[in-house]
A protein has these predicted regions:
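Class I S-adenosyl-L-methionine
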Residues: 1-229
Length: 229
């Protein structure tokens, strides 16, 4: 059975940037049931960002378990998280967990947030669900970053203006190039933070654009999801 927690180059970079934290994620195989707001980004999803066949197979296996035996999925995930948290504690560190590495669900992570003894020290996610951000930003420590897709301008503007959440934007900036210092959204210039340097979005103040470089099929995307720089 595939492990439900994953380590990546991004989590390694995160742990170097923040040595007091252990970072782990869950990667499911994206589909429109997992990501109900995926119409504008599904074809350029992170599932295409250079994953090897074995990694893709593991994502599919996790997703099958989620749908076919959700109770077992939840139990196995809790066991893995508690083991990771215990390991982090022994090292004098904290565990930061992102459930939606390649999905946009809430039921499972809310289950863990509602526990008296959460199986992590900090949970965070990216989401395109505007109402979820309004209702659950800060819920029992949960941190949310709103994902911009080129069409949810008004929602992004509201969250930035009121400093409710930062907004992530995928840009055409190449991997070896610097992201712009500011980005104009709806006529307003917002400061940009480099979201590729680490993944601990909960460490950042609100009111920022989180710039992400396009990866996989998104590099050649001409749709609304990836923003030209």
């Amino acid at each position: 059975m595939s492990a439900l927690l994953s380590k990546t180059i991004k989590t390694e970079k995160t742990e170097k940037e923040y040595p007091d934290w252990i970072n782990t994620l869950t990667y499911l195989y994206p589909n429109k049931n997992l990501c109900k707001f995926s119409d504008n980004c599904f074809n350029t999803c992170l599932k295409t960002s250079g994953r090897l066949p074995m990694a893709t197979k593991a994502m599919i296996n996790r997703t099958k378990l989620l749908y076919q035996d959700n109770d077992t999925f939840i139990n196995n995930l809790e066991n893995e998280l508690r083991k990771a948290k215990k390991s982090a504690n022994k090292k004098g560190k904290k565990l930061a967990y992102r459930f939606n590495g390649t999905s946009d669900r809430f039921e499972e992570i809310k289950h863990f947030l509602d526990m008296d003894n959460q199986p992590f020290h900090q949970a965070y996610d990216y989401t395109k669900d505007f109402k979820r951000v309004l209702d659950y930003q800060g819920y029992k420590g949960y941190n949310l970053t709103f994902s911009y897709d080129g069409l949810n301008n008004l929602e992004a503007k509201f969250l930035l203006k009121n400093k409710i959440a930062n907004v992530s934007i995928v840009m055409t900036t190449k991997r070896n190039e610097e992201l712009p210092k500011t980005y104009n959204l709806n006529g307003i210039d917002y400061p940009v933070l480099d979201g590729d340097k680490h993944d601990l979005r909960f460490t950042e103040n609100k009111g920022y654009i989180i710039g992400l470089r396009a990866k996989g099929k998104a590099i050649k995307n001409n749709g609304s999801f990836v923003q030209s720089i």
